[in-house]
From Swiss-Prot:
<keyword id="KW-0057">Aromatic amino acid biosynthesis</keyword>
<dbReference type="GO" id="GO:0004640">
    <property type="term" value="F:phosphoribosylanthranilate isomerase activity"/>
</dbReference>
<dbReference type="InterPro" id="IPR011060">
    <property type="entry name" value="RibuloseP-bd_barrel"/>
</dbReference>
<keyword id="KW-0210">Decarboxylase</keyword>
<dbReference type="InterPro" id="IPR001468">
    <property type="entry name" value="Indole-3-GlycerolPSynthase_CS"/>
</dbReference>
<dbReference type="Pfam" id="PF00218">
    <property type="entry name" value="IGPS"/>
</dbReference>
<keyword id="KW-0822">Tryptophan biosynthesis</keyword>
<comment type="pathway">
    <text>Amino-acid biosynthesis; L-tryptophan biosynthesis; L-tryptophan from chorismate: step 4/5.</text>
</comment>
<comment type="similarity">
    <text>Belongs to the TrpC family.</text>
</comment>
<keyword id="KW-0028">Amino-acid biosynthesis</keyword>
<protein>
    <recommendedName>
        <fullName>Indole-3-glycerol phosphate synthase</fullName>
        <ecNumber>4.1.1.48</ecNumber>
    </recommendedName>
</protein>
<dbReference type="GO" id="GO:0000162">
    <property type="term" value="P:L-tryptophan biosynthetic process"/>
</dbReference>
<keyword id="KW-0456">Lyase</keyword>
<dbReference type="InterPro" id="IPR013798">
    <property type="entry name" value="Indole-3-glycerol_P_synth_dom"/>
</dbReference>
<dbReference type="InterPro" id="IPR045186">
    <property type="entry name" value="Indole-3-glycerol_P_synth"/>
</dbReference>
<dbReference type="GO" id="GO:0004425">
    <property type="term" value="F:indole-3-glycerol-phosphate synthase activity"/>
</dbReference>
<dbReference type="InterPro" id="IPR013785">
    <property type="entry name" value="Aldolase_TIM"/>
</dbReference>
Length: 252
C-alpha cells in the first residue's frame, strides 16, 4: 500500500466511529481568501502545527500547540494549519480546538477529510477553513464535500498535485487552491511541482504552494505566481519558530 492508501484505510475506520455532532456557532475571524486578495505585496504564510509525519516520523512530539501557534501569529502568519490526524501525524481535534481558542487569525483543519462528520467537527472546534485533497477523493465525493463545507460557511482549500487535479479544482470553482509539492503516494517533495503547475493558473483564484520550504530562497521560487506558502516541518524543528517564520515572508 502507498502512504495515501494506508492513511485512507485508517480514516474510514476513524470516521465510522466518529459521532455526528450538532452544528455550533462558527468562530469569528476574517476570510482567508479576502485576506490574501487584500495583501498581495508579500507572500503570506500558513504556518503549521505538526508533531510527526509518516515519512519523517517524530518531528516535535513535545510541542505545545498553543505556544507554537501564538509564535506563528506574532510572526505575521495569515493562517495556522493544525494537523488533526492522530495515527500518522500524532495530532488531535483538541489541538485544533485549543489553537483556535487562543489565536485571532483563521485556522485550517489539516486532515484527510472524507465525510461531512469531519467538516462539522472541524467547524465546531474552531476551524474556519478545511482541506479537501483531490487525490484522496472521487470527483463525486469531492463535489459533495465541497458543497457541504460551503453550506457550513467554511472556506475550502482544495489540494492538487498535477495538471489533471488542477483542472478539476478550477472546474469545481475553488477560490483557494493548494499545490502540494509532496506526492502523497510516495511522500517525495519537489518544489518544481508548483513551478510547473503555475503555467495553467486561472484568475480570481488564490494559490498556495505547500511543502518543501526551508529558506526564503525556496519561497522566492514561487513568489510571483502564488499568494502564500504552507510550511510545517521547517518551522516545527526551529528553536525560535517566530524568527524562522518571519524569515519566510518575502516580497512578491
Amino acid at each position: 500500500m502507498t502512504f495515501l492508501e494506508e492513511i485512507l484505510a485508517q480514516k474510514v475506520i476513524e470516521v465510522a466511529e466518529m459521532p455526528l455532532e450538532k452544528v455550533k456557532d462558527k468562530r469569528e475571524t476574517y476570510s482567508f481568501y479576502d485576506f490574501l486578495k487584500a495583501h498581495p505585496e508579500k507572500m503570506q504564510l500558513i504556518a503549521e502545527v505538526k508533531r510527526a509525519s509518516p515519512s519523517k516520523g517524530e518531528i516535535n512530539m513535545g510541542v505545545d500547540p498553543v505556544t507554537q501557534a501564538k509564535s506563528y501569529e506574532a510572526a505575521g502568519a495569515g493562517m495556522i494549519s493544525v494537523l488533526t490526524d492522530p495515527v500518522f501525524f500524532k495530532g488531535s481535534i483538541e489541538d485544533l480546538r485549543e489553537v483556535a481558542r487562543n489565536v485571532k487569525i483563521p485556522v485550517i483543519c489539516k486532515d484527510f477529510i472524507i465525510s461531512e462528520k469531519q467538516l462539522i467537527r472541524a467547524r465546531n472546534a474552531g476551524a474556519t477553513v478545511v482541506l479537501l485533497i483531490i487525490s484522496a477523493l472521487s470527483e463525486a465525493a469531492l463535489k459533495t464535500l465541497f458543497e457541504q463545507a460551503t453550506a457550513l460557511d467554511l472556506e475550502v482549500l482544495v489540494e492538487v498535485h498535477d495538471q489533471k487535479e488542477l483542472a478539476i479544482a478550477q472546474k469545481l470553482g475553488a477560490k483557494l487552491i493548494g499545490v502540494n509539492n509532496r506526492n502523497l503516494h510516495t511522500f517525495e517533495v519537489d518544489i518544481a511541482v508548483s513551478e510547473k503547475l503555475a503555467r495553467d493558473f486561472s484568475t480570481n483564484v488564490c494559490f498556495i504552494s505547500e511543502s518543501g520550504f526551508k529558506t526564503a530562497e525556496d519561497v522566492g521560487r514561487v513568489s510571483k505566481e502564488y499568494n502564500a506558502v504552507l510550511v510545517g516541518e521547517a518551522l516545527m524543528r526551529e528553536k525560535s519558530p517566530e524568527v524562522a517564520a518571519k524569515r519566510l515572508k518575502v516580497k512578491r
